Amino acid sequence: MSFDYRALATAALVAISSLALAAMASGPEIKTAVTGKTIHGNMDSTGPYAEYYTADGVVHGKDYKAKWSVEGDKMCWTYEGSPKDCWDVEISGDQVRWVKDGKSQGSGTIVEGNPNNF
C-alpha cells in the first residue's frame, strides 16, 4: 500500500487557505469592531501605535489625525500627505490583524472607547 504525501500536502494547503480567507472580516464587521474604539498594536513597518476611531471617520493618534473608511470589505486610511491605503482585516474577539497583499503586516488589540483621551 502506497501513501500519496503530495495529495495530503495539497489538501492541507487548500484547507489552510480556506481558513485564512474565511477569517477576513466583512465591511460591516470592520465598522462594528472599530467604531468608537481604540486599537493598540504594532505594525511591522512602523512599530507601535494607538488610534481611536470615531463614528464620523476620523482617526485620532497621539500627535496626529487622519481619516478612515470602509470600502467593500477593506479598511482604508488617509494620512496627511499620503494617498488612501486600503487593507484586509482579520478580527477575532478583541484581536485584529492587518493584512496587505495577502501578508500580515501588523496586529492590535481593540479596546472600548478612548482610554488615551485622543
Predicted regions and their residues:
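Lipid interaction determinants
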Residues: 2-3, 13, 18-118
